[in-house]
Amino acid sequence: MKAFMDKDFLLETEMAQKLYHEYAAKMPILDYHCHINPQEIAEDRKFENITQVWLGGDHYKWRQMRSNGVEEKYITGDASDREKFQKWAETLEKAIGNPLYHWSHLELQRYFGYYGALNGETAEEVWNLCNAKLQEDGMSARNLIRQSNVTLVCTTDDPVDSLEWHEKIAADESFEVRVLPAWRPDKAMNLEKTDYLEYLKKLEVVSGVKIDSFASLIEALRIRMDYFAEHGCSVSDHGLEYVMYAPASEEEIEAIFAKRLRGEAVSRADELQFKTAYMVALGREYHKKNWVMQLHYGVKRDNNGMIFGKLGPDAGIDCINNYAPSSEMADYLNALAITDELPKTILYSLNPTDNAAIGTIIGCFQSEEARGKIQQGSAWWFNDNKQGMIEQMTSLANLGLLGNFIGMLTDSRSFLSYTRHEYFRRIMCNLIGGWVENGEYPADEKVLGRMVQDISYNNAVRYFGF
């Protein structure tokens, strides 16, 4: 029997061990998509206790605590941090096979030097150890980033954001890690939302544009894109129900938008036509600016109305949406490609059954502009577990070029989540090592070592051009 999460954790062959320890492990991290609050980096936040780091905004953990029958007061309510940690520890011991079990223990090992198992009985010991460690200077937000060997972080930012915290970080020469904004303009697209007109007023203020037409909406966004670009932004991100394509004329789009500006509701057909026009218009802008476009789709959000009413979005009540016609995604990409205005694009579906569809679609739109211009994104959200990563990389290898894959991202709100890169690299090295062990690829250490280093870091550096 193997030891619990030792140095060869998840590395089943000699080649896998060699590739990870001698090549992948030492590579830096380029975290091109996360939800970390830049204010916490600017102010170099120190955390009072492990609950603040682990449970403050982690809806992955909240879901499992609810699944364990934990009262909401111990999850997002007014229970003490020690009580919340106890409930999490009692939940974690039941999470065999869940990535949260592995992530949590990798974090305990790497940042706190704890190699035991966290459960209800050890909670007090771990609580005291972690909290003592968190008082050290080396455990501040910036130092956690430094010790994780991170070179660059892309946060997730709305077009109306001031980016003041990014400015403060950039002006501080004592912090060598680049922290750049990433453009997330979902609120300007979601005209079906009840607060849409309120949002447009905010966009008018920051852009200086009177938004009285679809054309003026795009102009306001273009001005904000220029502002983001001045702050180093070259990455966009969209959260979509699915990648739709319902084309309409300019006149039809203007009529739909005018109806919404009057405070009237729009039909589902109108909504899809508007969103299509919006995504095509922004895709063209990204191509002009040489930005990378990320499309996250296949989500049905905020399903539990009672919890949503109390906590709002990002509360752990989202699920997979299995309606995502690949034909419409292909048509959307083609609408940009046919006029040579398709930017570098990364496609992420929450539904693992979309892996093969994505793999075939990206092969239709590659070009000499970049190696792997159109990427299948790393296994995302409910898929960033051992099996999900294996399935995503295997599908990509079956249908494309795994050697050009840009690899992992944290997609997290926590400064301890960089161990997800280690988790990914171990799984990736084990997958490749297994193919070599099985005689499916030559045991050429030089070629293989370069490949795993590229997937771990170098491909992302080349692709994004930071």
Predicted regions and their residues:
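Short, basic/hydrophobic alpha-helical segments
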Residues: 332-338
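Short glycine/proline- and charge-enriched loop/turn segments
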Residues: 308-316
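Metal-cofactor-binding active-site regions of metalloenzymes
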Residues: 2-289, 341-343, 347-359, 363-466
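C-terminal amphipathic alpha-helical interaction region
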Residues: 293-295
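Metal/cofactor-centered catalytic core regions of large enzymes
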Residues: 270, 316-320
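Hard-cation-handling environments
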Residues: 299, 304
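Divalent-cation-assisted or electrostatically stabilized phosphate/pyrophosphate-binding catalytic cores
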Residues: 323-329
